[in-house]
Design a protein with these regions (language model features):
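Cytochrome P450 heme-thiolate monooxygenase catalytic core
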Residues: 69-74, 92, 108-272
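Cytochrome P450 heme-binding "Cys pocket" and the immediately downstream C-terminal segment
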Residues: 285-287, 382-385, 402-438
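Conserved cytochrome P450 K-helix E-x-x-R motif and the immediately C-terminal K′/meander segment
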Residues: 17-36, 302-341
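Short, small-residue alpha-helix embedded
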Residues: 269-282, 412
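Cytochrome P450 I-helix active-site segment
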Residues: 5-10, 15, 113, 117, ...
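Conserved cytochrome P450 K-helix/beta-meander segment immediately N-terminal to the heme-binding cysteine loop
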Residues: 353-380
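N-terminal membrane-proximal hinge/A-helix region immediately C-terminal to the signal-anchor transmembrane segment
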Residues: 1-95, 111-122, 142, 154-158, ...
């Protein structure tokens, strides 16, 4: 066996960058079909390898995770997220993860059900049968308000929600695949760079306002007992971070980085997962009818305890995230020279772990492009290769907000499903890649009476 993995031939100077930037999803699918488990790509100055076998995913994310760190893909990511939990490494990451853990304890997450349902019902009060809503936009607004309440311990008004949403678009555009970014520095006074810098500054202002609102209150005073889960002190993330700052464990920059990470990562992925779920249910009337019957059987507004009575809703959400994973590929960097599937992977190489490819592969799923929620039924679970599904990552660095995101998504689905019928009235999906996978167009949903 050659020690160099196979891969597609690139263009002079641009390598595979132009093909990838035109349609990353079609490109990843095509090269996976053509070249197998380990694929060499030419996407920039670093050696890049795409891994499409779940067993290699398990190695990189779980069994040998310490040998594969988070890469610095773009200085703009540092400008946006800094040294927050998503991007930090080593002792810094361990410190921040340990600090944040109480905010994501299962008991605390379950106690957020009233806030999730309350915000959802507030949103529904502005909807009427016959309305045609952009479901992606509406869900993004809703999940911004929910994440601020859940993790910042406060609420924000409609104007602040609008400000956040308006400034997410230039951020998303900045991270869309573009081979020319390799030669255009972030400090260059291009229109895109200026819009990105302005958006970051505006969002940092929103964060600073939220912090100022809470700073110095009784809830953020230092607790001599520390931030244990059973502490009488508030366990929202902002309170925890402010108490840590009072103890000298966090700087102002640390605080901002963590809160920016949570504001952006904590709402976008959930809103997108729900957008694709409503879209898929609209395309499959039988599944929608089963979903509606299940949520109608609840005795009143859904609670965290009710989720165990919503097995089909859980399957629907899992299947939506399989077909349309909001995070469509993970990136890691090899910290050492190593071998994967017999191929040499040099230190410093960039590794792509594409959920988009693995989730949709006929190697791991029967009829992989079909929407089949019952593939997640217990009697079929053993059919699946374990790491053929990883919408939240896996291993020690899996998404810390996974359980909250799932609770939030299922409660929103149940609340909306009990209130309205819905039908998608838009065009065929045109997907765009950025930090997340999002539709490149509005997602109109027509509401009707149940």
């Amino acid at each position: 066996m050659s020690t160099r993995p196979p891969g597609p031939r690139g263009e002079p100077l641009l390598g595979n960058g132009r093909r990838y930037s035109r349609d990353p999803f079609a490109f990843m699918t095509a090269v996976a079909d053509a070249y197998g488990d380990v694929i060499r790509l030419d996407l920039g100055p670093r050696e890049t390898y795409m891994l499409t076998n779940p067993r290699d995913v398990e190695r990189v994310l779980v069994s040998d995770w310490a040998a594969f760190g988070k890469p610095n893909l773009d200085d703009a990511v540092d400008d946006l997220l800094g040294d927050g939990l998503l991007m930090s490494e080593g002792d810094r990451w361990r410190q921040q993860r340990d600090l944040a853990n109480p905010a994501f304890h299962a008991r605390r997450i379950a106690g957020l059900d009233d806030a999730v349902v309350g915000h959802t019902e507030d949103a529904l009060s502005g909807w009427e049968a016959g309305d045609r809503i952009d479901v992606q936009l509406e869900l993004a607004r809703l999940t911004v308000r929910i994440i601020v309440t859940a993790m910042f311990g406060t609420d924000i008004g409609e104007e602040t929600v609008k400000t956040v949403q308006e400034n997410l678009e230039p951020l998303g555009q900045r991270f869309e695949p573009n081979p020319m970014r390799a030669v255009i520095p972030n400090w260059a006074p291009t229109r895109e760079n200026r819009q990105f810098d302005d958006a970051v500054a505006t969002l940092e202002g929103v964060i600073d306002d939220l912090v100022a609102r809470r700073r110095g209150t009784e809830e953020t005073a230092s607790d001599p007992a520390g931030d244990a889960v059973d502490s009488p002190m508030p366990m929202d993330l902002l309170s925890i971070l402010l108490r840590a700052q009072n103890r000298g464990e966090q700087t102002e920059g640390d605080l901002r980085d963590e809160l920016m990470t949570m504001l952006l990562a904590g709402h976008d992925t959930t809103a997108l997962a729900l957008t694709y779920t409503f879209y898929l249910l609209s395309q499959h009337p039988d599944a929608k009818a089963r979903f509606q019957a299940e949520v109608d059987a609840l005795d009143g507004a859904p609670t965290a305890d009710d989720l165990r009575d919503l097995p089909f809703t859980d399957r629907v959400l899992s299947e939506a995230m399989r077909l349309y994973p909001p995070v469509y590929t993970l990136f890691r960097e090899s910290k050492v020279d190593t071998r994967i599937a017999g191929y040499r992977i040099p230190e410093g190489s960039l590794l792509m772990l594409p959920q988009w490819v693995i989730h949709r592969s006929e190697r791991w799923y029967d009829d992989p492009l079909a929407f089949d929620p019952d593939r997640w039924a217990p009697d079929r679970a053993s059919e699946r290769e374990r790491f053929a599904y990883f919408p939240f990552g896996a291993g020690p660095r899996h998404c810390i907000g996974k359980q909250f995101s799932l609770l939030e998504a299922k409660l929103i689905l149940a609340t909306v499903g009990r209130a309205f019928d819905f039908d998608y009235e838009g065009s065929e999906l045109d997907l765009r890649g950025s930090l997340t996978m999002h539709p490149g167009h509005p997602m109109p949903l027509r509401l009707s009476e149940r």
